[in-house]
Amino acid sequence: MGVRDSHGEAAGTPDPVEKGIATLNTIRIGVKAMVHKDGALRKAEILSIKQRKDGLAFYVHYVDFNKRLDEWVASSRLDLSQEVEWPQPEKPEKKKSGPAKAPSKNKRVRAGSRDVSATPDTLTGKNTNVGKAQRPSKAGGKENRGDETPADLSMLASEAVSADGTPKAVSEDIDMMDASFTDAKEIKEEERALGLMSREEEIEKLRTSGSMTQNPTEVHRVRNLDRLQMGKYDIEPWYFSPYPASFSDAEVVYIDEFCLSYFDNKRAFERHRTKCTLTHPPGNEIYRDDNISFFEVDGRRQRTWCRNLCLLSKLFLDHKTLYYDVDPFLFYCMCTRDETGCHLVGYFSKEKESGEGYNLACILTLPQYQRRGYGRLLISFSYELSKREGKVGSPEKPLSDLGLLGYRQYWRETLVEILLDSGRETVSENELAMLTSMTEKDVHETLVTFKMLRYNKGQWIIVLTDEVIEERNKRLEKEKIKGSRKIDPARLQWKPPVFTASSRTWNW
């Protein structure tokens, strides 16, 4: 039997790319053209087109570049003197031949048109009360998720947002999982495959493959917000996040830095600020030192706040899957303090009970606080919690590209410090895992990645190369000059929480 692709068709040579000269009247979504970027011409794919007062504008993705560089460009930046690549025409679906499969008599037919409960108004971010949210009806839960696909694929927001701007109850869960970095071709292949899957298979694929959204349409690849104002910072979002569709027309989206409610109107935001009394994340403060504090927030007790946090973080995290159930997660939020309150710097989420032994599900440092060492603090804090639990842990796999770099740096620095301990002559990978609360697999992969594991005279030995030692010395010199932030385990006031069965499961 010959090689076949995912659709069952024989795999052969790829279809030839159709090229030709385009004009502003003939150019369309999916075309790849040369665009002026930073003084150079770069190939870019057109993802969306809209009419502005000053003419046509094109939302482009630069081929082989990170999606955070996607942007709207004026027509003058397109070089139409060169040939463009036209998108491949869609192939007609082949009808499957053969007798229809009779339904099983043992399976009970499930009603496909049960009413779905409306989502509470608090989800819109307006008039939000960060208190104990109402328990959503289970009518929007897992048992009601059929195989149907939204018919209107031209919506600017995702299927998680209804026409009135309120996230639908069908997606009552937000779960943001790290996934591997994939290039544009892989994403397209995955998105094409998603169209042939059932809802359950699609969700499972999203959790493991790194696809950005459930709906395989081009509109979801377009960043929908232009600018955020959060506290004293103006922030440019990187990626799409399913905020209400009306927010895409706002010049600035205002986010309350304490309760994380969101507004597309400055006056409404200012009125909210006069009434909002929250000055820190709505949870228990479990760590405090001279610089930062950590708050533990239960997704079940503070659903609205945690959902708002996940919506915000989706703007800066690619290849994430969003659901609207935060009940099975704890959120550990890192803040800086001043006279006005505790300002959110970053967070990581953690499953209340992970069958795979993960100690972290999703991690983010907000852009305005990046490159200051806060990411390493978040990673370090997650392992301090694992040490307090007496367990080894690992971040949810696979990691994003930036997440993998951050973790590898932390793993290497942690292992090198232990290996350079003068009072330790021999050590095994298992002992390193117990000392650091890292898994043996993470220990082994770190040693292999940085060429610290060698085979000599019939046994494996750990070797610290000159390069590794030199990098450590440079880091220590830099820390002497600039200082360094570290987690002090003695300041951690925390015991591993114990949950009932209902509080650590999906709210379906």
Curated annotation (Swiss-Prot):
GO terms for molecular function: chromatin binding; histone acetyltransferase activity; histone crotonyltransferase activity; histone H4K12 acetyltransferase activity; peptide 2-hydroxyisobutyryltransferase activity; transcription coregulator activity. GO terms for cellular component: chromatin; NuA4 histone acetyltransferase complex; nucleosome; nucleus; piccolo histone acetyltransferase complex. Acetyl-CoA binds at A361, C362, I363, L364, T365, Q370, R371, R372, G373, Y374, G375, R376, S400. Pfam families: MOZ_SAS (PF01853), Tudor-knot (PF11717), zf-MYST (PF17772). Residues 119-131 have a biased composition (Polar residues). Gene3D superfamilies: 2.30.30.140, 3.40.630.30, N-acetyl transferase-like (3.30.60.60), Winged helix-like DNA-binding domain superfamily/Winged helix DNA-binding domain (1.10.10.10). It comes from the Eukaryota. Its main location: nucleus. Autoacetylation at Lys-320 is required for proper function. The keyword Magnesium does not apply. Catalytic component of the NuA4 histone acetyltransferase (HAT) complex which is involved in epigenetic transcriptional activation of selected genes principally by acetylation of nucleosomal histones H4, H3, H2B, H2A and H2A variant H2A.Z. Acetylates histone H4 to form H4K5ac, H4K8ac, H4K12ac and H4K16ac, histone H3 to form H3K14ac, and histone H2A to form H2AK4ac and H2AK7ac. The NuA4 complex is involved in the DNA damage response and is required for chromosome segregation. The NuA4 complex plays a direct role in repair of DNA double-strand breaks (DSBs) through homologous recombination. Belongs to the MYST (SAS/MOZ) family. This is Histone acetyltransferase esa1. It comes from Emericella nidulans (strain FGSC A4 / ATCC 38163 / CBS 112.46 / NRRL 194 / M139) (Aspergillus nidulans).
